[in-house]
C-alpha cells in the first residue's frame, strides 16, 4: 500500500484539489470533511464560523460512551455513560442561556461510533467540539479533572497515553474497529489546517482548566495532548474533558450528586464562554493592526 506524504509545497486548498487529491476515494466522514475543509477554510486558519440562524455560535457537546459501551464503572456501580450525559445536559443549558447554540451528540443511552461523533460536529457546523468523560484508572487514588487536546506527535504524558488508548477502544465494545479512516486527512489537511486548530484547542483547554480549578481538584494543570480519535477534526477546535475519575471512591460519590455535576458543568461552560471572549478580543486586535 502506498503512503501519502504531506504536500508541504501546496499552500491553498485549490492547489490541493488541482493536485488530484479530490479524485481520491475517501470513505464516509473523511470524504465529507475533506471537501468541506478544502473548499471553505481559508489561509489554513481554524476559526469560529458565521452561523445561519441568528449568528449564534455552535458548540457540540459529546457525552462519552453510551449504549453497550458503559465507559468506566465505579466501585459502587456508577456508570460513566450516565454521569457524563447528565453533566453534558447541564453544560448545554448554561451555554444556551448565554446565547450559544449548544447541541449533544447523544441525548439518551445510545452508542455512537467515535468517528460518527466527529462527523456530527461537522454536520452541525460546530465552532467547538467537546467530549465529556469521567474515566477510570487502575489506581483508585487517581483523582482530579483533566483536559486533553489532539496530538499528532505522541502523548504528552503516560496518563494521557493510557486514557487515549482506553477511549480509542470504545468502538470495539460494539464489535466495531476504530480504523484511521481519516489517514489522508492527517497527512494532508494537518499541514494546512490542523496546526492552528490544535493551538486553539490548547487555548480552549486552558480556559476550561482555569474555571475548574477553583471548584475541583486538577489532575493536570495544563492541557494534555494525545491521539484521541474523537478529537481528530481538521478545523474544529476540540477538547476532551475528564471531569473526574469515577474509579476514585470519593469522586464517584461527588459525581453522584446533582450539586457537583452542576458545579463542574458551570465551570466547563464558563471556560467555553471565556474562550469565545478571548477569541473575539484577538480578532478585534488583529483588525486594528
UniProtKB/Swiss-Prot annotation:
Native organism taxonomy: Bacteria, Pseudomonadati, Pseudomonadota, Gammaproteobacteria, Enterobacterales
Residues that span the membrane, as ranges: none
Task of the protein: Cell-wall hydrolase involved in septum cleavage during cell division. Can also act as powerful autolysin in the presence of murein synthesis inhibitors.
InterPro entries the UniProt entry points to: MurNAc-LAA_cat, N-acetylmuramoyl_amidase_3, TAT_signal
Keyword set, alphabetical order: Cell wall biogenesis/degradation, Hydrolase, Periplasm, Signal
Protein name (record): N-acetylmuramoyl-L-alanine amidase AmiA
Enzyme Commission designation: 3.5.1.28
GO cellular component, one term: periplasmic space
Domain of life the protein comes from: Bacteria
Subcellular location: Periplasm
Composition bias, Basic residues: 46-55
Primary location group: periplasm
Disruption phenotype: Mutants are growing in chains of 3 to 6 cells.
